[in-house]
């Protein structure tokens, strides 16, 4: 009886390992395809191509995101930001990190310590990556200052749902400015510029009045 149980557990472990390997392979294939799209279509590593999108998401409520922050606390967006003017930066690829940083860092510097404002960074990953969450989130915790952990919420799930809901292109990072009710009032794509940052700041100040 004991040997039978151990044989069963051994078989179960092998099966689980195979499933995990297949999921990792699926995720890697998804990433390679996305990166190839990025390399083939992205016009410049430092471009900011707002002309490719007409801000169709403005006026919509930001779609619900439910996941844990790097602080290991559950966060429900946009409800967690209700009552505040909020910048949410979204990225799908590693290559987009510098793009969303170009929005987040100036915003945090100008509004991070002001009452009535908040911000979130939301990396969006395919659901298959959830099996590697402890490694991914652990690496992010090591590279991000602890005081910002509560502002980073990695979404593991149906990425395509958000791409369709907000009319997004996974090649780019995005910055969404929400009013106190969670409605998108301003949007930025790609890298920020002095002009687009000025527009972001002016809109944030107006929404706070």
Regions found by a protein language model. Give the residues of each.
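N-terminal secretory signal peptides that target proteins for export/translocation
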Residues: 1-12
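Thiol-/selenol-based redox modules, centered on thioredoxin-like
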Residues: 171-209
């Amino acid at each position: 009886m004991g040997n039978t149980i151990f044989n069963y557990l051994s078989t179960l472990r092998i099966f689980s390992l195979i499933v995990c390997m297949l999921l990792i392979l699926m995720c890697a294939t998804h990433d390679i395809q996305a990166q190839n799209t990025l390399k083939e279509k992205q016009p410049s590593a430092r471009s900011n191509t707002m002309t490719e999108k007409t801000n169709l998401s403005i006026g919509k409520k930001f779609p619900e995101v439910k996941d844990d922050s790097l602080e290991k606390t559950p966060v429900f967006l946009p409800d967690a930001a209700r009552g505040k003017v909020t910048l949410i930066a979204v990225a799908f690829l590693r290559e987009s990190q510098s793009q969303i940083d170009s929005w987040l860092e100036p915003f945090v510097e100008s509004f991070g310590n002001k009452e009535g404002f908040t911000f979130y960074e939301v990396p969006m990953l395919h659901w298959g990556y959830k099996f590697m969450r402890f490694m991914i989130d652990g690496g992010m915790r090591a590279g991000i200052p602890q005081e910002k952990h509560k502002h980073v919420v990695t979404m593991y799930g149906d990425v395509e749902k958000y791409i369709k809901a907000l009319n997004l292109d996974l090649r780019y990072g995005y910055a969404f400015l929400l009013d106190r009710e969670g409605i998108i009032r301003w949007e930025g794509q790609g890298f920020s510029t002095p002009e687009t940052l000025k527009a972001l700041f002016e809109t944030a100040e107006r929404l706070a009045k």
